[in-house]
């Protein structure tokens, strides 16, 4: 009986034995129109482009698009439970741009984002926080209070932070639509190029490593 068990175990360890593939890491991109892909086909939206970029580097991931155009941080909080289903293993949180455009009190935005973070932590779902910067025309006081939200929350909750989601896109006509706000398909590619190293750091925290070619 022992010989049979040993032979069976040895057979299972032979080179070339087919092993079941691990399922992909399930992420959710929770955000507004910048995540949803305003006026873009689904395959050109941020989550889809990021997923392809990560897969090209050997990561096994699936990124659900939970972006809603026009959403605020409070709106994201209201829909958190159904936008981030059970089984989610990480969240890329991108909210606050519409709060800023509406001149919402930064204290309101901060509270909503922090509540989202805390509730996800309670569910043991790690968060990558994608930051936003206030427009210059909102004044120095508002900008100071708003811009501090993201680094403050990242420090307080030990989050991976990408300081400015639209870095390389905001103010660049070649990368924005005619409204001057939303990224074009080219702009989304620029966003992904910028955030990719930060996402890889986040995946490292989750124990996710890229597969080596040939595996």
Model-derived regions: residue spans:
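N-terminal export leaders
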Residues: 1-4
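Cleavable N-terminal signal peptides
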Residues: 7-8, 18
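Serine-esterase "nucleophile elbow" of acetyl-processing enzymes
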Residues: 19-69, 79-87
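Alpha-helical cap/lid subdomain in secreted, periplasmic
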Residues: 22, 49, 56-59, 75-215
């Amino acid at each position: 009986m022992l010989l049979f068990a040993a032979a069976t175990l040895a057979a299972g360890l032979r080179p070339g034995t087919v092993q079941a593939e691990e399922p992909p890491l399930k992420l959710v991109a929770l955000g507004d129109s910048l995540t949803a892909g305003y006026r873009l086909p689904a395959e050109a939206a941020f989550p889809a482009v990021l997923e392809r970029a990560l897969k090209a580097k050997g990561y096994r991931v699936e990124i659900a698009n939970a972006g809603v155009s026009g959403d605020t941080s409070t709106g994201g909080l209201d829909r958190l439970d159904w936008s981030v289903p059970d089984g989610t293993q990480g969240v890329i949180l991108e909210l606050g741009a519409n709060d800023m455009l509406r001149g919402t009190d930064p204290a309101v935005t901060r509270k909503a984002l922090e509540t989202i973070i805390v509730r996800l932590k309670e569910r043991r779902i790690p968060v990558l926080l994608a930051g936003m910067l206030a427009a210059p025309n909102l004044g120095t006081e508002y900008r100071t209070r708003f811009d501090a939200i993201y680094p403050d929350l990242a420090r307080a909750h030990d989050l991976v932070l990408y300081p400015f989601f639209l870095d390389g896109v905001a103010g660049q006509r070649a990368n924005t639509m005619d409204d001057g706000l939303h990224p074009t398909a080219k702009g989304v590619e620029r966003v992904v190029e910028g955030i990719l190293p930060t996402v890889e750091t986040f995946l490292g925290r989750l124990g996710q490593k890229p597969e080596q070619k040939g595996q």
